């Protein structure tokens, strides 16, 4: 297989309200690399953070892609043209201090690896380190659409692994966007007892209940701290997972967690924001606070295994589909935080009937 053309269409990001369809050369590949024709790629919430993207723009976004291998460079023996794959956009060096400790996402090489140019393009090049460490063949029963959730759900799986639960623990998830729903799906596989879901959107609260949350709380019309304790024998949550990237959400999480509990921070506020915390109260509460950035090859393989086994439902999380010219609309939809979760981009156009 070879690409039909030497140029391709890409969605070039300049700002949240300025995404342009442009033409770029189809990337050449070298030893150990593969060229992939993008079938579908999810839009990540991080790809709407202008403070994060400003220094990188203009840029082709998209790091949750699935596609078909078009060609493989010399030395590639695990993949052949026609293979259906998901490619993770980061890979560790496997030889540094952090890699030796299993903290792969802290590896200096990790965030320097990338897809060329990105998933919002008709084709992309996967460099050799990505091919070697974190390119996954999709099993026959895992669709291209389902494969797009591997990377983001792997991030939430990593967060749960860093926040181990005891049987019967009461947990709370703050923020019910796509990532919050991923936490919910995975928490239903854990030994948790009550699962509280918190959001300002009634639509998202209803969705959370359908995915396994036992209680939905809306901070807009009730005192969620008092309500959670009323429903939990006077106690706070044993573990709180915060997915909203705001200090207010972090403060809410700390207020909801029980003494001796765990607070997991799953999304970053803008740089420079300082979190004022009562340090004395925090000390005596013995609350453990952790955070997680990205995911690695152990997590992505685990999510693929869950998808193949039918243990998680990708279809329930995908709400919108767009062609390449719909990236800007998808960004605005995500920023609106309305009746949407995951939007997929189809660079070659949305099929009449997405692959089952």
Question: Where does each model-flagged region fall?
Answer:
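Mid-domain Rossmann-like dinucleotide-binding core that forms the NAD(H)/NADP(H) cofactor-binding site
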Residues: 142-222, 226, 241
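C-terminal hydrophobic helical "lid"/dimerization subdomain
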Residues: 2-10, 251-255, 297-356
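NAD(P)H dinucleotide-binding glycine-rich loop of Rossmann-like/cofactor-binding domains
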Residues: 93-174
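Glycine-rich beta-strand-centered segment in the early N-terminal region that forms part
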Residues: 26-41, 52-97, 139
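Glycine-rich cofactor phosphate-binding loops and adjacent beta1-alpha1 units
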Residues: 163, 189, 206, 211-288, ...
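Short strand-turn motif at the edge of the Rossmann-like AdoMet-binding core
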Residues: 266-270, 292-294, 322
């Amino acid at each position: 297989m070879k690409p039909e053309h030497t140029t391709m269409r890409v969605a070039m990001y300049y700002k949240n309200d300025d995404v342009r369809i442009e033409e770029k050369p189809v990337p050449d590949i070298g030893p150990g690399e593969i060229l992939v024709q993008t079938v579908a790629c999810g839009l990540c919430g991080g790809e709407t953070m202008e403070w994060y993207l400003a220094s990188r723009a203009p840029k082709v976004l998209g790091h949750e892609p699935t596609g078909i291998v078009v060609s493989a460079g010399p030395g590639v023996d695990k993949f052949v043209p026609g293979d259906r794959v998901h490619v993770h956009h980061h890979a560790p060096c496997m030889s540094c201090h952090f890699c030796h400790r299993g903290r792969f996402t802290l590896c200096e090489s990790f965030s320097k690896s990338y897809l060329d140019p990105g998933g919002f393009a008709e084709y992309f090049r996967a460099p050799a380190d990505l091919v070697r460490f974190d390119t996954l063949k999709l099993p026959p029963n895992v669709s291209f659409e389902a494969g797009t959730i591997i990377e983001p759900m792997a991030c939430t799986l990593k967060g749960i692994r860093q926040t181990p639960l005891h049987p019967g623990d009461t947990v709370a998830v703050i923020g019910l966007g796509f990532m919050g729903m991923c936490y919910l799906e995975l928490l239903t596989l854990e030994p948790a007892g009550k699962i509280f879901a918190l959001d300002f959107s009634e639509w998202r609260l209803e969705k959370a209940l359908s995915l396994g949350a036992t209680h939905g709380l809306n901070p807009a019309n009730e005192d969620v701290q008092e309500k959670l304790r009323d429903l939990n024998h006077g106690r706070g949550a044993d573990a709180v997972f915060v997915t909203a990237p705001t200090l207010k959400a972090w403060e809410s999480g700390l207020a909801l967690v029980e003494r001796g509990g765990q607070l997991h921070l799953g999304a970053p506020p803008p740089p420079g924001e300082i979190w004022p915390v009562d340090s004395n109260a925090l000390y005596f509460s013995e609350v453990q606070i952790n955070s997680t950035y990205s995911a690695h090859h152990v997590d992505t393989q685990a999510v693929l295994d869950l998808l193949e086994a039918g243990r998680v439902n990708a279809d329930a999380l995908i709400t919108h589909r767009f062609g390449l010219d719909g990236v800007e609309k998808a960004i605005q939809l995500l920023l609106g935080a309305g009746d949407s979760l995951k939007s997929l981009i189809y660079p070659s156009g949305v099929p009449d009937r997405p692959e089952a």
